[in-house]
From Swiss-Prot:
GO biological process: maturation of LSU-rRNA from tricistronic rRNA transcript (SSU-rRNA, 5.8S rRNA, LSU-rRNA); translation
Protein's name according to its UniProt entry: Large ribosomal subunit protein uL29
A GO CC term assigned to this protein in UniProt: cytosolic large ribosomal subunit
SUPFAM superfamilies tied to this protein: Ribosomal protein L29 (L29p)
Name of encoding gene: RPL35
Keywords linked to the UniProt accession: Ribonucleoprotein, Ribosomal protein
Length: 142
């Protein structure tokens, strides 16, 4: 599997049974969704083989690689899910109502609190009083 990104050959080292180095997230961001899913399948397959070897106790050297592969799976899933969420945000930006998981994460009090427009609103009586009775200005005689 050889992919050319920005005139550099990347991921030739990421073939099955060869996940020895850390996976770099900035390299993953350049990949398409199909490539990410393919890489995810390869990683999960690799993880399954490592777990089998752990149970059968055939390769003790492979035990340390389990954490690397697990973290690589998490990185691929994170990049993929972030991309999907951004696409959903763009889709719902024009619409008046957005799903709860795309809204900003706030505390319950801030979610239930009044908006700035509601805070600045005045009753009719307050408006009339402000109009007809301006603030008094006092001059002090020195």
């Amino acid at each position: 599997m050889e992919i050319v990104i920005n005139n550099v050959k990347n991921f030739s080292k990421w073939t099955l049974h060869n996940f020895t180095e850390k996976l770099r997230v900035f390299e993953l961001r350049d990949k398409s969704d199909a490539e990410l899913l393919k890489l995810l399948d390869d990683l999960k397959q690799e993880l399954a083989t490592f777990r089998v070897s752990k149970v059968t106790a055939t390769g003790t050297s492979k035990l340390s690689k389990i954490t690397l592969v697990r973290k690589a799976v998490a990185k691929v899933l994170t990049v993929y899910n972030q991309r999907k969420k951004e696409e959903a945000r763009k889709k719902y930006k024009k619409l008046s109502k957005t799903p709860l998981n795309l809204r900003p994460k706030l505390t319950r009090a801030k979610r239930k609190g009044l908006t700035t427009k509601q805070l600045t609103m005045k009753t009719i009586k307050e408006r009339k009083r402000a109009e007809n009775l301006p603030k008094r200005k006092y001059a002090l005689l020195a």
